[in-house]
Amino acid sequence: PHAIWLLCAPSAQDVLPTIRSRTRIVNLAVPSNQAVAKFLESQGFEPNIAARAARLSEGHIGIASLYAKDERVMTDRDELIVGVLGLHRASDAVLLAGNLIDNAKAQAEAEVNVKASEAEADFRRINGLGPKDRIPPKLRGAYNAIAKKDELKRRATRLTRDVLDRALNSAASIYRDVAVLQNNAEDAVGLINLENRSAITELSVRLDRTGAVRRLEDIATARRRLNGNG
């Protein structure tokens, strides 16, 4: 048997020379919107859905696939962008944050339960059992572990953080678009939130460049703290 070790680092210079000299370096890049859209189309999604999911995912194939196949997740993102653009008071932010957390928990719990049901069905199929067959005593422990309450709670907590992190990244995309407009760089890099172009254009006039950068930094700090919550 053979094994392949994949060592991941921000750059080759971040790897010790003694290790780097014994490896083959493969430089990865964020795929373009066109490449992601083409991949989604190859999976059977309509071109318009694939193109929008690719643009909103910012090169993340996993998130693009999620947007393309789950209309509810895409709708939640749309509502979040509108909500952030509509913030005027601190109380607005508190309400939006509360709704965001509630939606993240609900989405995480639903997805965890679906995956648990799929895992149970796979377990039955692999072991030659039908949907209504009794689980043999020797397999019962492994079967019950699939939907163990503590394990499901742990998975839901982790997935909730993933959903919140994705939401924070979506919020950051607003101020990224603001910075793009302020620097007249739309032709070079394009906008992510094209559907909200009018509101983002207005925000780019009201908010100075320093304010846009500060908000991006604040969101980045929130993401780091969220990821550090274990």
What are these regions (language model features)?
Residues 171:
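Conserved phosphate-interacting/catalytic interface
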